């Protein structure tokens, strides 16, 4: 049976289906009236095929410091604590007693012998102590007009713990090319009509971007939104891992390996690349990406522990969790809202808006 194939070309300018005009002997878009030579359009189509989007593949993680195994005697005196409520596991030295779970605040913690985890390559040591974290929470609550008064006066920090969160750090050089559909508008009028002309353009961009230490957290228990909101870290202060840095703190055991983290790394690299390239397209009314091709080279994965302070506080039988970057002091969290203050605030805004509108209408009349 013959292979019947219908080949349809799309207009690079507006995306409409292109037809062959027998009188012009050219391909023509009936939507924007753009004309194309067949060879030109064929070359554009081949270019799009060569820039088909795909997810880059990464080699399996290999420890920067060797095999990823702990050195002889390095884990002596280290223990694991497992929460009987949420199943969270943290690692620390035997002299640092865990009396609560930093993830859910539960106090039922079981200590057991530490075993079975990869040795990290790097660590960023804590720069801010516990008192600094408490002060940051107080500063975070200042100026919040809709915060219940009782939350501040009755607020007690139920648990506060410095914890090293496992992160996979991705390095890569991105060779990228992109095609955009851009438009420019021109307006004019005569005695009868107002006119708008839309001109379509194909814009091409290509270049190289180096990505150094793109972080993806390796813990299911940590909220990804929180962890990314705590960025950026200053990686110039990152040092080779050593167990002395764990003294007085805990380390979350990773439960998302490097392979499972690569899709998020690819997504972050792609989004950053598209954003960087799009920012160079200027002078147009609109700009829409049509195709993107990203080829990653020099790929490398490292395993690091990054410092985070977790604070839990209860208010009206609800637990509120806050997190702070243990290096930079960046603080995030969700606060309760006083419903009475909320409606009072918007009532005042509505009243002021109505008064202004009334005054303007009176002046106009």
At which residue positions do the language-model features occur?
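Short metal-binding segments enriched for Cys and/or His
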Residues: 36-50, 109-118
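Short, non-ligating residues that shape and space the ligands of small metal-coordination modules
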Residues: 18-21, 38-39, 92-93, 110-111
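Juxtamembrane/start-of-transmembrane alpha-helix segments at the extracytoplasmic/lumenal side
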Residues: 335-346
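Charged, low-complexity helical/coil segments in non-catalytic cytosolic or luminal regions
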Residues: 116-314
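Extended, hydrophilic extramembrane loops/domains of integral membrane proteins
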Residues: 306-334
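Short cysteine-rich clusters marking metal-coordination/redox-active sites
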Residues: 11-14, 29-32, 83-86, 101-104
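Juxtamembrane boundary at the C-terminal end of a transmembrane helix
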Residues: 356-365
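Residues immediately within or flanking Cys/His clusters that coordinate Zn2+
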Residues: 6-8, 24-26, 76-80, 98
């Amino acid at each position: 049976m013959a292979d019947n194939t219908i080949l349809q070309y799309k207009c690079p300018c507006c995306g409409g289906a292109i037809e062959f005009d027998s009188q012009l002997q050219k391909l023509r878009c009936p939507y924007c009236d753009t004309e194309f030579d067949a060879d030109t359009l064929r070359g554009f189509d081949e270019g799009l095929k060569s820039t088909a989007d795909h997810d880059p593949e990464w080699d399996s993680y290999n420890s920067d410091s060797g095999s990823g195994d702990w050195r002889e005697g390095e884990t002596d005196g280290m223990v694991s604590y497992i929460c009987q409520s949420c199943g969270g596991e943290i690692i620390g030295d035997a002299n640092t007693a865990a009396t609560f779970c930093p993830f859910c605040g539960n106090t039922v913690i079981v200590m057991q012998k530490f075993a079975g985890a990869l040795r990290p390559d790097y660590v960023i040591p804590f720069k801010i102590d516990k008192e600094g974290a408490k002060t940051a929470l107080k500063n975070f609550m200042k100026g919040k007009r809709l915060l219940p008064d009782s939350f501040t006066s009755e607020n007690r920090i139920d648990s506060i713990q410095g914890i090293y969160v496992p992160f996979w750090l991705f390095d890569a050089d991105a060779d990228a090319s992109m095609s955009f559909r851009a438009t420019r508008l021109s307006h004019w009028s005569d005695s009868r009509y107002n006119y708008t002309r839309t001109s379509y353009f194909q814009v091409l961009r290509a270049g190289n971007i180096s990505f150094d230490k793109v972080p993806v957290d390796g813990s299911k228990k940590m909220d990804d939104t929180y962890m990314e909101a705590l960025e950026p870290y200053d990686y110039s202060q990152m040092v080779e891992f050593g167990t002395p840095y764990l003294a007085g703190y805990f380390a979350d055991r990773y439960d998302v390996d490097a392979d499972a983290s690569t899709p998020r790394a690819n997504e972050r690299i792609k989004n950053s690349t598209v954003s960087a390239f799009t920012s160079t397209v200027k002078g147009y009314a609109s700009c829409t990406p049509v195709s993107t091709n990203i080829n990653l080279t020099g790929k490398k994965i490292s395993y690091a522990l990054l410092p985070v302070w977790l604070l839990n506080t209860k208010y009206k039988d609800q637990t509120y969790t806050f997190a702070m970057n243990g290096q930079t002091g960046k603080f995030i969290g969700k606060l309760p809202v006083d419903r009475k203050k909320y409606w009072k605030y918007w009532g005042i805004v509505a009243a002021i808006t109505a008064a202004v509108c009334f005054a303007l209408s009176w002046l106009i009349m």
